[in-house]
């Protein structure tokens, strides 16, 4: 197993690397500053008393504190998001903010592509903050929302939702549906023109699926036990002798 880029650089400069938080906490050496990026655990106050820490958080705090800010922003239909460099506290994402940078969140973003964009944005901002030195941070201001941890069952598509909500669901999560008892991952959909006559979950021969206000086309799917394929190819393989329903 190859070392991560961070570990490779640390080894090059003779810096100890550990994945054990207990070892780090017990170590008596004091660093000048700790940097945390997308770290999903609370850091003990005993560690923070030894070494001040800052965190690169993938949202515009206090919106989307918590474990899944990228996915929650897409699901909510946010049109803008960004990154914050914040002071780490023993409580969850409550620290004062040293710097923030905003970006547009488009209908083309998936959780993967948005994470990559935010990582680049956050990396650039972190370099700027470190280069200029930590200034006086600003307390978080505004309405607080929480990006609760995702569950696997949350990926199941509710076809009684609006088409745009189904699209967000697919772009944000490991979305899936069940057809004829088979679990099918939905990788990409296209929102179609709204229609007044729909049966949510019913699949048409053109690989479109009815929603509460219209339909989405299954562009790419990943059926259980097979590889990724187009929605049209998947339907051809199943045949179309009877109406198919996504559950």
Residue ranges of predicted features:
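One-carbon transfer enzymes
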Residues: 1-173, 211-217, 223-225, 230-232, ...
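Short, surface-exposed linear segments at secondary-structure transitions and domain or protein termini
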Residues: 192-202, 225-232, 236
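C-terminal substrate-binding/catalytic lobe of Rossmann-fold NAD(P)-dependent oxidoreductases
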Residues: 168-213
């Amino acid at each position: 197993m190859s070392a991560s880029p961070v570990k490779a650089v640390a080894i090059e400069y003779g810096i100890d690397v550990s994945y054990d938080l207990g070892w780090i906490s017990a170590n008596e050496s004091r660093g000048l500053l700790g940097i945390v990026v997308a770290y999903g655990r609370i850091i003990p106050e005993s560690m923070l008393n030894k070494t001040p820490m800052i965190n690169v958080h993938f949202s515009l705090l206090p919106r989307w504190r918590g474990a899944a800010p990228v996915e929650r922003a897409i699901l909510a239909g946010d049109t803008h998001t960004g990154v914050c460099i914040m002071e780490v506290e023993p409580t969850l994402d409550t620290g004062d903010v040293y710097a923030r940078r905003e970006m547009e969140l488009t209908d083309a973003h998936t959780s993967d592509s948005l994470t990559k964009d935010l990582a680049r944005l956050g990396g650039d901002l972190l370099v700027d903050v470190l280069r200029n030195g930590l200034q006086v941070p600003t307390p978080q201001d505004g309405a607080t929302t929480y990006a609760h941890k995702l569950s696997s069952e949350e990926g199941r598509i509710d076809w009684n939702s609006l088409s745009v909500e189904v699209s967000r669901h697919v772009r944000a999560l490991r979305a899936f549906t069940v057809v004829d008892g088979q679990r099918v991952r939905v990788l990409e959909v296209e929102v179609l023109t709204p229609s007044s006559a729909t049966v949510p979950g019913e699949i048409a021969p053109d690989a479109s699926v009815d929603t509460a206000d219209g339909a989405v086309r299954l562009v790419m799917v990943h059926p259980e036990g097979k590889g990724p394929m187009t929605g049209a190819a998947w339907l051809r393989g199943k045949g179309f002798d009877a109406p198919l329903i996504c559950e």
